[in-house]
Amino acid sequence: MHAVINTLRFKEPVDPTLFERAERELAGQMRAIEGFQGFRVVQVADDQVVLVIFADAAEALDRMATELGNTWMGANVAPLLDGAPERRIGPVIGSVSV
C-alpha cells in the first residue's frame, strides 16, 4: 500500500463545504480508479488541510493526481490556495486499524 500526503494552505479560512462537495462529486471517480483504498481530509489549522489518499500502488495515486487533481481540484481548490500544494508520496510501512 502507498499513500500520498498533500498539504494545502488556503488564502482564507477553510470552508468545510468545499470538501463535502468533493466527497459528493468525486467519490465515484475515486472508487473507479483501480487500487484506490481511501481518502481523508484533516483540517490542521483554520487555513490549512492535509489530504491523505491511500492506494495499492503509487501508480494509482499518480493516476488520481492526473485525472482528478488536474481537473476538479484545479478548478475548485487551486484558486483558493496560497501557493502550490506540498505533495509527498511513499509506501505505507506501518498501519493499525479497527
Regions found by a protein language model. Give the residues of each.
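Short S/T/G/P-rich N-terminal loop/turn motif that feeds into the first structured element of a domain
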Residues: 1-49, 56-68, 80-98
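Outer-membrane beta-barrel domain signature
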Residues: 70-78
